[in-house]
């Protein structure tokens, strides 16, 4: 009953590690859990109050898949104000989380056999998201000597006509390494071939 695509993905290492850590905690072990990336703070009160107010005011119906126009506009203004970036409203999409947005983007753009370059270490979900969309993850090891970041030379070695995406986030999950503007520009130059 399950599709072949789903049978090709592995169980979540994040969930498995988190479950093991919780098991050790229940057994009385002193464990610091770094697996699931759960914040160690509660949702701020003003956000909780706004959510409760929205529910009490009947804001409980379906909204557009890309987010409400008011939320898209608020995001557009935030990027203009805080980051000096101008985005068209049509280029702003709101999702339930990063994994959801990445999955949707790959679903819309990856064809069978397309390759996605993924610098390692990487967030454990990236390869499976590619596989679920019938693509091929291309893992590029990025060692400590480069700050766990992909270099233009390593990127160029892995780009080919089947390359559709470079999966790049800064700060990196899981290492926290950040790319400078110059590093991003150099990587961008490689992608313009």
Locate the predicted segments by residue.
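N-terminal small-domain helix-loop-helix segment of the aminotransferase-like
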Residues: 2-3, 7-97, 104
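Residue-level signal for alpha-helix termini/capping positions
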Residues: 26, 56, 110, 159-160, ...
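Structural signature of beta-strand start/N-cap positions in the alpha/beta core
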Residues: 30, 115, 136, 162-165
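Active-site phosphate-binding strand-loop segment of PLP-dependent enzymes
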Residues: 138, 143-193
């Amino acid at each position: 009953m399950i599709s072949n695509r789903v049978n090709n993905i592995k169980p979540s290492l994040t969930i498995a590690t988190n479950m093991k850590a919780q098991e050790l905690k229940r057994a009385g072990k002193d464990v610091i859990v770094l697996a699931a990336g759960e914040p160690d703070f509660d949702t701020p009160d003003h956000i909780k109050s706004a959510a409760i107010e929205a529910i009490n005011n009947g804001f409980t119906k379906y909204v557009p898949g890309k987010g409400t126009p008011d939320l898209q506009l608020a995001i557009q203004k935030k990027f203009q104000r805080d980051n000096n970036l101008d985005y068209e409203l049509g280029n702003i999409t709101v999702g339930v989380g990063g994994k959801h947005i990445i999955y949707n983007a790959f679903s819309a753009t990856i064809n069978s056999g397309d390759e996605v370059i993924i610098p390692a270490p990487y967030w454990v979900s990236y390869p499976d998201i590619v596989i679920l969309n019938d693509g091929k993850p291309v893992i590029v090891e990025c060692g400590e000597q480069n700050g766990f970041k992909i270099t233009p030379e390593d990127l160029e070695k892995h780009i080919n006509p089947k390359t559709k995406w470079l999966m790049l986030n800064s700060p990196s999950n899981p290492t926290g390494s950040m790319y400078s503007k110059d590093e991003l520009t150099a990587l961008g130059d490689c992608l313009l071939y």
